[in-house]
Every structure is written in C-alpha cells, then in structure tokens.
Amino acid sequence: MSHTTHPYQKELEVATLAVKRASLLTKQLSDSIVQTARSGTLTKDDKSPVTIGDFALQAIINHAIKLNFPSDEIVGEEDSQELQENSSLADQVLSLIIKIQQETSVYNDVVGTLTDKNKVFQSIDYGNSQGGLKGRFWALDPIDGTKGFLRGDQFAVCLALIEDGKVVLGVIGCPNLLENIVSNEEHSGVVGGLYSAVKGVGSFYSELFKEGAEPLSQQKPIKMQNHTNPSQLKVVEGVEKGHSSHSTQAEIKAKLGFDPTTVAKQTVNLDSQVKYCVLASGQADIYLRLPVSDTYREKIWDHAAGNILIYESGGQVGDVTGAPLNFGNGRTLDSKGVIAANKEIFDKVIDAVTEIRKSSTPRV
C-alpha cells in the first residue's frame, strides 16, 4: 500500500494535529514544573499540573475527534466531575486551552476550538466509552508517564484508533524525547518526536514541534532491528519499580544470556509509551513489563498506540504467554504483563519469561 492511498488519511491528519497541539501544551507545562521545582515552590505531592494537563488535553483531543467523526466513541481516562465541582480548576483549564488554541491557530480549521467551560466538560465526557469488540473507537492517554512529566523527563500523548478490536492507527507525541537514545546517559538529536503508525502502511518518525501534518511520504519510515546476539541486544523498561517487576526482568535478561558486566548499559529506563517509540525506531530490541501483582490489568490506552507502532515496524507484542493483546475486551486488557521484541528474538524472550515464572512465586 502506498503512503498516499491508505484509508485513514483524515483520521491521521486529525490525530496528528490534535496530538501536536496537546504536546505543545504539555511541553510548556512540564518545563514550567521543572522551573517551579528548581525554585523550591513545588511540593512533592502537588499533582495539580498533571490534573490540569490531563483535563485540557482530553478536552482538546476529544473535541477534535468528535468534530470530524461525530459517531466515533472515545475511551478516555478522565471524566469532568472534579472539574465541574472546582470552578478555579475549570478556569485554569479553559485558560490553558484558549492560550494553546491561539498559539496553534493554524490548526483550528481541522481540530476546532473550545471557548467555554460547558463545552470543555462535554468534550472531556466524550471519553466515557466502554470500548468492546465491535465498532470503532479511539483510546486516549492524555499524559502517559505522570511521574516522568513531573520530573521534566519522559512522558507521551498517546492516541489510537481501534476497529472491531484491532488497532488500525496510532499516534504518539513525545515532547521530551531526543531522536537518538543510546543508553540511559547518552541521548542526542532533535528534542520532541512524533511517532505514527497505520495498519498495513508502516511506522514513521517526524519532528513533533514542526508545524502542520506532514504526509507519511515526507516522514521517516522506522523499522526494528533483528538482533539476536545477547551482546547486541538492548532492553527498554520502566523507571518506576511500582509499575513492573524489575527483579523478575533482571532474571529474564540473565536467562537470555546478557553479560552481567554490561547488562546495565544494555538497559534503557524510560517512562511511558516512549519505550515503544525507541523500540520501533530500532534503538532497542526488547520491552519488558512484567506484572507486579497477579490481579493487575493494564488499561488499553496505555498500550494501544504503542502496539501498532511495534507491529508496523516489524516487531511483535504479547502478554507474558506470548498471546497478542486483545483491545476488544473493554477498557482493560484481559491479560498479564506486556512483552514486545523484534520477531527474531520474541519467542526466546517468551520462553525465558515462562521459565522464570514457573520457578518464581505465584504472583509473577
């Protein structure tokens, strides 16, 4: 399929411009948080910038979707109740939205504008879909990687389109991600990446803060590498230990033959779906997210956009048993953990996971 003939042209344009507008807003917020933290006026438990950002982004992106595709449903993280009960918070959210609309007014014809609080509440509440196996809906994570966002580190704006339980389009904006990620210490290149994937077409990289929606033919196609030698492999995993089992992941790397003297340099720790972007662009080979408890289930918006990015760049994604993730099961994935890897190594990774899980405590 050529880059110019895929059936999701309009969807991709709307998703791209909505994510670009939203990403610019989050970049400004994240940078201001870092400045505030440096001045010593941000308390550790102050989550208000995240709350404001989440609400503003969900309103902006949901409005763009409903303006262009009124019959589409949206699975979103927030509802507007807290905002409706706090007029000061609502004023802050509306003010941010109006400001970013003025700064990105060139996008208004495509993604629309919000000018009053009631429209903001309504747009946020469009995200109340339960998803499911039939029909068409979008999955949105407005600020994926909250802790990275607060640190001024990695976070992502993630939007995916799902049809009959299958992801067909994904767009991930990574405001703080540098183009080249070699290790935890070595990052270089342009700051801000936009990663897009369309089913049957491929995965692509472009500069996030470049104005407009470039056609895929002008974007950089990205592909996973096919490394299998343990000395060449790199693993991406989360920063926060509460999100995945780092100790189990260390055992898996040992089982795969990683050299204990170099494994630290071969592991890149990143918050959010940024991990999928680094993997899809061939800068890492394996993504491990082992469950920290037997009952935890992932939310679909945490993985939908990343899932298609990996498949369309030549990789494979599954749960801890290797089974593909099912995005038609409602708002959560009915499976444990997430493993992604290049196709050459995927089965070996799943075998290692299976062996470690058999020999460890039942919770893994």
Curated annotation (Swiss-Prot):
Residues the entry annotates as binding Mg(2+) 1: E77, D141, I143
Acetylation found in the keyword field: no
Entry binding sites for AMP: H243, S272, K275, R289, D302
Nuclease in keyword set: no
EC code(s) of this entry: 3.1.3.7
Residues reported to bind Mg(2+) 3: E77
MF term (GO), any: 3'(2'),5'-bisphosphate nucleotidase activity
Domain of life: Eukaryota
SUPFAM superfamilies per record: Carbohydrate phosphatase (SSF56655)
Annotated residues for binding of adenosine 3',5'-bisphosphate: T146, H243, S272, K275, R289, D302
InterPro entries: DPNP, Inositol_monoP_metal-BS, Inositol_monoP_superfamily, Inositol_monophosphatase-like, Inositol_monophosphatase_CS
Family: Belongs to the inositol monophosphatase superfamily.
Protein name: 3'(2'),5'-bisphosphate nucleotidase 1
Organism: Candida albicans (strain WO-1) (Yeast)
Gene: HAL21
